Regions:
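Short hydrophobic/aromatic beta-strand immediately N-terminal to the Walker A/P-loop
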Residues: 5-7
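P-loop (Walker A) phosphate-binding loop of NTP-binding proteins
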Residues: 11
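Conserved lysine of the Walker
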Residues: 16
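Hydrophobic positions on the alpha1 helix immediately C-terminal to the Walker A/P-loop
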Residues: 19
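Post-Walker A helix-loop "phosphate-sensing" segment adjacent to the P-loop in P-loop NTPases
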Residues: 24-33
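Conserved nucleotide-sensing/catalytic segment adjacent to the nucleotide-binding pocket
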Residues: 33, 42-90
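A glycine- and Lys/Arg-enriched "phosphate-lid" helix/loop adjacent to the NTP-binding pocket
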Residues: 52-55, 105, 110-156
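NTP-dependent small-molecule kinase module
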Residues: 127, 149-191
């Protein structure tokens, strides 16, 4: 069976994770595998916490793209991979990994573009980072203004032109979600 790869891109807080999770809920983990792009941040064990806090995590160079590409190839070849786990509280990869099994469909959170209003995205990011990642409001706002917003304008927003599908509001857009689900169903039936 040929594997279908679905890439999901969009700005911070746009709904990429929600959309990916809803695809998995629709089919189950035996049919759909997810590689979460954030887990592929490079390790920086050589730096102290304060230095890691100052890194620009929104530039493409922040990611271990070679490892991500290797894992995609392995999954497409039917092999399982151990996806790294990024720990937001220490601004570094943890020693843990998550086993990701090969499946007919691989969702890569990084040619679907999730387009959500900038005000909604920043509010979602603030809520998520403060509640789930233990960040302070000041640190989230400072990071947004110094790296997130400029990198979004330089790298994320231009990638929208390359998308096959642009989904307003991410996983909350039921019509778009159903369209993706139907595409995946068709792929699974043809296999």
């Amino acid at each position: 069976m040929e594997t279908i790869l679905i890439g999901i891109a969009g700005g911070t807080g746009s709904g990429k994770t929600t959309l990916a999770d809803k695809l998995v809920e629709s089919f189950g983990s035996n049919e759909v595998s997810i590689l979460r792009h954030d887990n592929y941040y490079k390790r920086h064990d050589e730096m102290c916490y304060e230095e890691r806090c100052k890194l620009n995590y929104d530039h493409p160079d922040a990611f271990d793209t070679d490892l991500l590409c290797e894992h995609i190839r392995m999954l497409k070849d039917g092999k399982s991979v151990n996806m790294p786990v990024y720990d937001y509280t220490i601004h570094n990869r943890s020693d843990e990994t998550i086993a990701v099994n090969a499946a007919p469909v691989i969702v890569l959170e990084i040619k679907v573009f999730v387009d959500t209003d900038a005000d909604v995205r920043i509010l979602r990011r603030i809520i998520r980072d403060v509640k789930e990642r233990g960040r302070s409001l000041d640190s989230v706002v400072s990071q947004y203004l110094t790296t997130v917003k400029p990198m979004h304008e330089q790298f994320v927003e231009p990638s929208k032109r390359m998308a096959d599908i642009i989904i307003p509001e991410g996983g909350e857009n039921i019509v778009a979600l159903e369209m993706l689900i139907e595409r995946v169903k068709k792929h699974l039936q043809e296999a």
